[in-house]
Amino acid sequence: MRLITLFLLLLLLAIQYPLWLGKGGWLRVWDMQKQVTAQNQRNAELKQRNTKLEGEVKDLKEGTGAIEERARYELGMVKDDEGFVQFVAPAPKTSETPLPPPPPAGQQAHH
């Protein structure tokens, strides 16, 4: 009886191996599902990027507004009857108190 039980237990383990660890087993299916989810997310990001790029291409092909905007912001170009004005942030205020003079040459600070 013990021999039959041991044999059936080994047979059960042999049957379980492909289910969990074999080709097409649960672990591989779970891993593939994670990969598919990651790829779907990447595809959605790329679709959104492509849609944005298609809109830019359409604007560049159909009108001069997009070209003018790029020339102004990316290349700093202006029209003939315009003047270029650039606003610069004010420099940070410096301290009004002067720094102490450096020690005379030849003397070292003792700690």
Curated annotation (Swiss-Prot):
Periplasmic-side positions: 22-111
Subunit structure: Part of a complex composed of FtsB, FtsL and FtsQ.
Family the UniProt entry places it in: Belongs to the FtsB family.
NCBIfam families: PRK00888.1
Membrane topology classification: Single-pass type II membrane protein
Alphabetized UniProt keyword annotations: Cell cycle, Cell division, Cell inner membrane, Cell membrane, Coiled coil, Membrane, Transmembrane, Transmembrane helix
Cellular component aspect of the GO annotation: cell division site; cell septum; plasma membrane
Name of the featured protein: Cell division protein FtsB
Cytoplasmic topological domain residue ranges: 1-3
Pfam family, one: DivIC
Function: Essential cell division protein. May link together the upstream cell division proteins, which are predominantly cytoplasmic, with the downstream cell division proteins, which are predominantly periplasmic.
Parts of the chain that traverse the membrane: 4-21
Spans annotated as Disordered: 89-111
